[in-house]
């Protein structure tokens, strides 16, 4: 459940900005039908930053209810205050989620020792499996391989989502962790190379609109069929890149709407709808991928 193509799911909203239960069900059904390994609910792509704490919990619980055991659900529970991250994580202790994705603290930029103590404290307050999340382009904070190695010794810290796009990190981390520690790419454009170097899968934005392709690509990679996997990846490469032509999740929400997976591409401020130019770029990438 922690390998293959794991989708960083968008949070669908109606025109007033309320979470749409019907569209959420449609998205979950789409991923169940198309081979997605698991769903990350209310991560960065799921607009965790603009949901209240109550809404955050409600969306995860709604996702669990609608998934109904058909696909594993991972809760995004990161925060830049350790006590807040612990509280968010503990909310899901007995909920049915299979694990939590916890991003490095953002904006306050802790030291490596601060990062270690932060994730150690979260792990000590839950039995849920923890997936570390390193995305310095968003957080301003880069968790180094040596810190990951220390954290990997903690029993319920079982994986990392490594979103630097720096492929040397795969080897660096693998040298410092046990063989059962899971390495997940957080960068669609380099995910296949990441897996070829020994990674186990990807937490994917692209999978929101290309679930079957991403699942097939990851399956082929896991089987060592990289030539075949690369055919899929080359077709998706413009999409991997253009889904970030504007800040995530602006482009992917519009793409979901364009494919009829959600009713609107509504976001909450300060996120604003995609520009006309951005829409044209994403549309061309969807067409190149054979999705539109």
Curated annotation (Swiss-Prot):
The keyword Coiled coil does not apply. GO terms for biological process: diaminopimelate biosynthetic process; lysine biosynthetic process via diaminopimelate. Keywords: Amino-acid biosynthesis, Cytoplasm, Diaminopimelate biosynthesis, Lyase, Lysine biosynthesis, Schiff base. Pyruvate binds at residues 45, 203. It is an enzyme of class 4 (lyase). CDD domains: DHDPS. This is 4-hydroxy-tetrahydrodipicolinate synthase. The active site is at 133 (proton donor/acceptor), 161 (schiff-base intermediate with substrate). It holds the Pfam family DHDPS. Its EC number is 4.3.3.7. Belongs to the DapA family. Homotetramer; dimer of dimers. GO terms for molecular function: 4-hydroxy-tetrahydrodipicolinate synthase activity. Its main location: cytoplasm. NCBIfam families: dapA. The record marks 44, 107 as: Part of a proton relay during catalysis. HAMAP family: DapA. It is found in: Cytoplasm. InterPro entries: Aldolase_TIM, DapA, DapA-like, Schiff_base-form_aldolases_AS, Schiff_base-form_aldolases_CS. The gene is dapA. Catalyzes the condensation of (S)-aspartate-beta-semialdehyde [(S)-ASA] and pyruvate to 4-hydroxy-tetrahydrodipicolinate (HTPA). The keyword Lyase applies. It catalyses: L-aspartate 4-semialdehyde + pyruvate = (2S,4S)-4-hydroxy-2,3,4,5-tetrahydrodipicolinate + H2O + H(+).
């Amino acid at each position: 459940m922690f390998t293959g193509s794991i989708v960083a799911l968008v949070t669908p909203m109606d025109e007033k900005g309320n979470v749409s239960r019907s569209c959420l069900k449609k998205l979950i059904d789409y991923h169940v039908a198309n081979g997605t390994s698991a769903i990350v609910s209310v991560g960065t792509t799921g607009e965790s930053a603009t949901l209240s704490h109550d809404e955050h919990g409600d969306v995860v619980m709604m996702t669990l209810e609608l998934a109904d055991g058909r696909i594993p659900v991972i809760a995004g529970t990161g925060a830049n205050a350790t006590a807040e991250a612990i509280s968010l994580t503990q909310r899901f202790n007995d909920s049915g989620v299979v694990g939590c994705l916890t991003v490095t603290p953002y904006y306050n930029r802790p030291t490596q020792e601060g990062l270690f103590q932060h994730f150690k404290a979260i792990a000590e307050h839950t039995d849920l499996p923890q997936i570390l999340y390193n995305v310095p382009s968003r957080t301003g904070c880069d968790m180094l391989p040596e810190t990951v190695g220390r954290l990997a010794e903690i029993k319920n810290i079982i994986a990392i989502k490594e979103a630097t796009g720096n492929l040397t990190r795969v080897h660096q981390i693998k040298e410092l962790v046990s063989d059962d520690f899971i390495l997940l790419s957080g960068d669609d454009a380099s995910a296949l190379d990441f897996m070829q170097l020994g990674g186990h899968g990807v937490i994917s934005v692209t999978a929101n609109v290309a679930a079957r392709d991403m699942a097939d690509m990851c399956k082929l990679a896991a089987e060592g069929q990289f030539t075949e996997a690369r055919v899929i990846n080359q077709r998706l490469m413009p999409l991997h890149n253009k889904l970030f032509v504007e800040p995530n999740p602006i482009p992917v929400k519009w793409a979901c709407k364009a494919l009829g997976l959600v009713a609107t591409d509504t976001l909450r401020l300060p996120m604003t709808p995609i520009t006309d130019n951005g829409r044209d770029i994403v549309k061309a990438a969807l067409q190149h991928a054979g999705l539109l």
